Amino acid sequence: MNILIFGGSGKMGAAVAWDLVKQADVESVGLVGRNEDSLKKTANWVNSSKIRLHTLDIMDVEASKALMEAYDVGVSTLPDRRTSYRVVDTAIQAGLDIVDMLEEYHRRPDPYEVEGLEKPEGMSLNEYGDWLHEEALAKNVTFLDGIGFAPGISNITVGEGIRKLDQADCAVARVGGIPSKEAADRHPLRYMITWAFDHVLREYMIRLNVIKDGKIVEVDASSECEGFKFTKFGQNEVLECAITPGMPSFLYTRPELQEFAEKTVRWPGHWEGIKTLKEIGMLDLEPVEIQGIKIAPRDFLLAVIEPKLQPLEGDTDVCVMWNTVTGTKDGKKHRIDYYLWDEADTELGISSMARVTGFSAAIGALFIGRGKITKKGIVPPEDAFDSELYEDFLDELELRNISILEEITPLG
């Protein structure tokens, strides 16, 4: 098969490419980006004769369509909603099966901070999402939507937990990419950039939907902070998590849930710092005037803080997950927990975030190309990886030294 990666010069795109070129049934891997030098840098690092470089502005729809005709599956690793939607829209029109790792659920785009997302004139966001789904069905396209770490692994494990129960009542996903403990102490907010930080701040600020008492309700991001101790995989760390706009597909694909939320994991102190920044207005987008110059407080903050959050020499990251599903099985209450603790591959120079995100997207593309995932339209991970494919997915993760621990506990 031939697989085309959009955003091929970024860290996530590079990780996807590194994984794909090692598969015997992958003949070529195309890298798409606007900067030829950046693409060459990725190609040199991947170091495979299977790599093909394509310098292209993805906003050029006709050129993108023409390129897509030479490939079997596409992977979007782009860092914002404007480019993400453009690529998947174009792929659907071109009849190309596509995997996207950024957006949580294209069929129901959240209305906050749309990041330049362009939709057909006269359509609401929800109408656009439904239109994309119907177009994909009409074009016989599989659009695997939100496949990485979170969304992605988190959706797949929570979906499996729900399937294992006769009746699932509550699901909480706790996921996040954090610096190693040593690196956290060297950075403000005990945080280090492993993902597009402007997009991270967006997810701290918007309002989002969760399920409470069986109803969809809107809450503030960064709320309901919860502390916990992570003791699996030989760890013994105190962490915190707060609600963020992750995995909203469950509001629609698993409406039987009485409670549902996704929370982002951070080191203690991070969420208190974010709360302070929110309270003083530093994360606002409304411009303020400073010495005759208008600038959004968040843009100013990004300019100041991003350099201080970049990894220093020797810094590594960790990805952590603790997902919980509760409900009944054979008339008795049960809790099912899923755990992950993944560290960076320092030998290869691949961050943990790139491993769990990029490798998951690569597996998704491979499963489509191999005919394992056949559902058409917009397909969220919890539906794409059903009971049969769930074990196959875990096996593929294990081949990449990523382990998921499942624990089932009767409750009384």
Could you say what each language-model-derived stretch is?
Residues A66-A70, R82-E103:
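Rossmann-fold NAD(P) dinucleotide-binding segment
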Residues T55-V73:
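Conserved Rossmann-fold cofactor-binding substructure of NAD(P)-dependent oxidoreductases
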